Amino acid sequence: MMTRRKKRSCSNQKKEEEKSERIPFDLVIEILLRLPVKSIARFRYVSKLWQSTLRGQHFTESYLTISSSRPKILFTCLKDCETFFFSSPHPQDLSPIAANLHMSFPISCPSNICRPVRGWLCGLHQRTTKGTTVTEPLICNPSTGESVVLRKVKTRRKGVISFLGFDPIDKNFKVLCMTRSCIGRADSEEHQVHTLETGKKPSRKMIECDILHYPVPVEHTNGFSQYDGVCINGVLYYLAIVHGVSDDRYPDVVCFEFGSDKFKYIKKVAGHDMEILYLGRRLNSILVNYKGKLAKLQPNMPNNVCTGIQLWVLEDAEKHEWSSHIYVLPPPWRNVYEETKLCFVGTTRKGEIVLSPNTISDFFYLLYYNPDRNTITIVKIKGMETFQSHKAYTFLDHLEDVNLVPIWRM
């Protein structure tokens, strides 16, 4: 009798201990939201419950919201026909920051990579089939290592221009693809939109463009052209020559609304169209997301001497209204720029303007200019020394997304 009571007592005690040690599932979710993306990818296979939960919209949106509060810097560089991805946190002080290698993807030229959109990127992948080289958009997530190739770009032409965007209404990633005319001017033709919808096969549709234009490359590298575009609140903006509107030497801005599949153009104002030359080379000007608005960064060059930065901010797209801000930089600017070719990277959420060298060296760094304080801060980047002399591209505000490619079922 005593033995039975003892066994029963031990059994009840064990059950009570199990109850006290069991963690509420809501608390488990809170813990998971703070784990790296790759850990989330592994935990999807723990059970069907975890799989459905971690793939659910509530969890993925919550994870992205947390990631938005701590965005990272993304670096890409080409080596041995592979594009390698590194990331690092934003600097908190003057201390060097380490760039951690994620992985590589078969993107033939990193200059063809669109800027990250909610953690995803779009680059161009080349493959040879039956003796013919085919160029296809490749969508990838550097955080999870997942990628997918859009093999149904309907064209026989090699020159495909692709831009990645996100439709905030339908909450789908979309890719705008267009080809270049082979005869005469390189006008955009065969406009297509690919929709990447969760749980479904990617869909494609041809769309009409009533604006005769051609996107303007901002750089040429090893036979490839780099086209610069930025997606803000579901609208893609890129530089282009609009026939009948633009001067053939100086581009306007064309915008594409992913929600309505409509093209529009935005006229530039006097000062946008300056031919920018310095030390015998052309300086870059780029479109950026400046505090939620479209903006354009370009060097300020009175008398062909670089003295600062000019920031154009789009205040009203319908009225084609821009505001201009000129920042005269402190003396260290000229010394740094003359020694190393710097490129505009973008702007931080605080409004700082960021530049960097376009080639990795033993002292690769980011230059932060604070317009309010008129100060320059240089932060060294470590971890990419084995890629010295290779070209690098830097992206700000990279987010980590836990959505995985397989749910798109190619």
Swiss-Prot record:
Q: Where is the F-box domain?
A: 17-66
Which InterPro entries does the protein's record reference? F-box-assoc_dom_typ3, F-box-assoc_interact_dom, F-box-like_dom_sf, F-box_dom
Q: Which NCBIfam families does this chain map to?
A: F_box_assoc_1
UniProt-recorded name of the protein:
F-box protein At3g61340
Upper lineage ranks?
Eukaryota, Viridiplantae, Streptophyta, Embryophyta, Tracheophyta
